[in-house]
Amino acid sequence: MKILVDENMPYARDLFSRLGEVTAVPGRPIPVAQLADADALMVRSVTKVNESLLAGKPIKFVGTATAGTDHVDEAWLKQAGIGFSAAPGCNAIAVVEYVFSSLLMLAERDGFSLHDRTVGIVGVGNVGRRLQARLEALGIKTLLCDPPRADRGDEGDFRSLDELVQHADILTFHTPLFKDGPYKTLHLADEKLIRSLKPGAILINACRGAVVDNTALLTCLNEGQKLSVVLDVWEGEPELNVELLTKVDIGTPHIAGYTLEGKARGTTQVFEAYSKFIGHEQHVALDTLLPAPEFGRITLHGPLDQPTLKRLVHLVYDVRRDDAPLRKVAGIPGEFDKLRKNYLERREWSSLYVICDDASAASLLCKLGFNAVHHPAR
């Protein structure tokens, strides 16, 4: 049994070698010749999986180690009788922590408290729900917009997008990319929406590049609209609008979900799905794969305020470490993908062990996802 895996999927060689012969290949582009005798293909979002790639090939199963699936023609795979699995929620925590890192940086730079801001969350799936929970743990007001969930009658106080635009100080997008249909998200943030944002609003896109109309956004910024922008995803990746990059406050190369834990979850989820598909079901404990974190433990004295939270968050991950490298190489062919391929190890907040002498601080940090304990001061 021959299994092709994206060379940038961590732990893929070791895990899938339990099931067959593993060959690691680049994801963009996939070497088509390798597909001629392969039984399974494991990809990331950079690989377009469709009829033109797989027609006439012996592939029986495709797995994507990503939450999003807009790069995969699922309908064709089903028609062709090819098994498929994604990894929903694998990087949700990572994306939430990316958003927090960005917001805390902007809050420090611009001198505001997040408690004085209302956050509008567009898309309330794995990422949006977790983001809402952490913001509300901090006492920060949120507004939710998710028409598909609202129409299904899912639990939640869902509002219209117009209402979020009117009332939110921060608007953050966490939707799939739907190019048509009743829940179309292509250019959901169009020129009209962008112009309607509150003065000084923060716009964040960490889902799919085309959810925000990049040309319209650049037009508004060039005209002097007072707006802070955080973009992790771009229309036309791996190409991007270099002029737009110069105008945004934070720009990164589609790495919001790139924690070691998130990547490992993606790999293990598709590994478990494929092992079940071939009748050799196996389960993997994530902590058996991950290395020890860089920081062993730290001690926190007193209550948790925003500056202290910012220091803790940026100790684990400061988004500026990914903004600067992109600006240096933007527009150079191949460099966007190189930044992703050679991405520095990044951990999640749970890797940081925090000893607190304040019980409320320990409790709050645990709700936020840190590994925190309360030890009273002596």
From Swiss-Prot:
Record field: transmembrane: none
Keywords (A to Z) from UniProt: Cytoplasm, NAD, Oxidoreductase, Pyridoxine biosynthesis
EC number: 1.1.1.290
Record function comment: Catalyzes the oxidation of erythronate-4-phosphate to 3-hydroxy-2-oxo-4-phosphonooxybutanoate.
Catalytic activity annotation: 4-phospho-D-erythronate + NAD(+) = (R)-3-hydroxy-2-oxo-4-phosphooxybutanoate + NADH + H(+)
Pfam families: 2-Hacid_dh, 2-Hacid_dh_C, DUF3410
Gene Ontology molecular-function annotations: 4-phosphoerythronate dehydrogenase activity; NAD binding; protein dimerization activity
Gene3D superfamilies tied to this protein: 3.30.1370.170, NAD(P)-binding Rossmann-like Domain
The keyword Oxidoreductase appears for this protein: yes
UniProt-recorded name of the protein: Erythronate-4-phosphate dehydrogenase
UniProt pathway: Cofactor biosynthesis; pyridoxine 5'-phosphate biosynthesis; pyridoxine 5'-phosphate from D-erythrose 4-phosphate: step 2/5
One of the protein's GO biological processes: pyridoxine biosynthetic process
Species of the source: Shigella boydii serotype 18 (strain CDC 3083-94 / BS512)
Any one cellular-component term (Gene Ontology): cytosol
Gene: pdxB
Amino acids binding substrate: 45, 66, 258
Compartment(s) of residence: Cytoplasm
Residues annotated as binding NAD(+): 146, 175, 232, 257
